[in-house]
């Protein structure tokens, strides 16, 4: 979709396509554009039979650049890689959503890459199934949470994988030792978000990491949570 805000034109892609620049400006700084690239998140792991749930998938990678001539409030993760466009078509890749674990003891899939202008955001790491055996979360833009159970002491997937600066995401949460107190023996962890790590395994629901907000679409929206 294409919308306008003041003198700015905002192109939003929710699927693959082509960003077409028909004509550039005679003023060079106006050809440096703002962009936001967000990948798809990882799926959540399959749950158990009432004794334990799967861990959360990590958020897709988040990468943003704000042109000096674009008047909006950027996220805390705004980067420093400018793109100067010319009159041509730029392929857009939007990562398809991941699959969650469909049943107990079934893992999810990782998220998928989104890209434009050679700027790529990594898909989120998958969550793992519970409760039959603990596993480490998968790495990705943000990492998937670790799952609980025996033998325990599992690690959330690493975020910002592959590494970029500023970071595109954070780690998934970890799980504790086995056996744990009965109420938390199978607790799994939350996936990471662009704005913070996933919550470690504990009794009760585990939260995923928070996203980050940007006004690149002319109003504040939180992404990659």
Map each language-model feature to its residues.
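Glycine-biased low-complexity/repetitive sequence motifs
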Residues: 1-225
């Amino acid at each position: 979709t294409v919308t306008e805000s003041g003198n700015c034109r905002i192109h939003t892609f929710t699927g693959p396509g082509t960003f077409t620049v028909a004509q550039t400006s005679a003023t060079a700084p106006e050809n440096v554009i703002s962009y936001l690239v967000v990948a798809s998140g990882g799926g959540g792991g399959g749950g158990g039979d009432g004794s334990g749930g799967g861990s959360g998938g990590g958020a897709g990678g988040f990468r943003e650049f704000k042109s000096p001539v674009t008047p909006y409030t950027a996220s805390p993760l705004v980067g420093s890689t400018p793109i100067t466009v010319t009159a041509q078509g730029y392929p857009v890749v939007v990562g398809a959503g991941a699959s969650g674990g469909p049943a107990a003891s079934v893992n999810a899939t990782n998220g998928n890459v989104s890209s434009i202008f050679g700027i790529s955001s990594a898909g989120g790491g998958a969550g793992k199934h519970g409760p039959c055996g603990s596993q480490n979360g998968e790495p990705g833009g943000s990492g998937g949470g670790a799952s609980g159970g025996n033998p325990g002491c599992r690690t959330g997937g690493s975020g910002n994988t592959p590494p970029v600066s500023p970071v595109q995401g954070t780690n998934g949460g970890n799980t504790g030792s086995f056996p744990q107190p009965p109420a938390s023996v199978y607790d799994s962890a939350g996936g990471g978000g662009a704005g913070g790590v996933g919550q470690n395994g504990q009794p009760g629901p585990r939260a995923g990491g928070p996203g980050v907000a940007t006004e690149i679409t002319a109003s504040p929206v939180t992404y990659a949570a």
